[in-house]
Amino acid sequence: MQRDSGSSEVAVRRATADDAQAIGAVFDAAVRAGWTYLGELAQKPMFAPEDWDQLVADHGPPKVLLVATGRAGQVVGYTAAHPDDGELFLLFVHPAYAGQGIGRALLGAAHDALRAAGCRQAYLYTHEQNERALAVYESAGYRRDGSVRESEFGGTTIRELRIVKQL
């Protein structure tokens, strides 16, 4: 499926096994550039290459794992969702492509997939200090519902806000 991402056209499609390492590279670059609130933890790879292979293997249908590709076919972003409960749990765009509407294109495609699976609501958790992501989600119609999730990662407490959108 082609989606207009604002300044350029981006293709959004289901991820394949061949995309696994590119998905990992997008994640690492996005985290290094955007998760400054995690300090040193964000500056080193968080997952091994085989973890990305497993992510793709675990997210075949009916689960949703979509990639956005640029003009040359390179993976520039991705998102993952669980249609059983409407959770959108990953959305990353390579920082070199930030601000071009790729995140919006991925969100739209994920919403379409969730709707097709019968979901009436989408939700996600994002770090309370991830202001850029919160702004993108809120401009797409997500609203904070007051729920908070805390977890530990690398000795750091991660506090995430839940936001929801009616589909």
Give short role names for the model-derived ranges:
Residues E9-A11:
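Extreme N-terminal starter segment of soluble prokaryotic enzymes
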Residues A98, R115, E138:
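Short polybasic/polar patches that bind polyanions
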Residues R120-L134, E138-L167:
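C-terminal "cap" of GNAT-fold acetyltransferases
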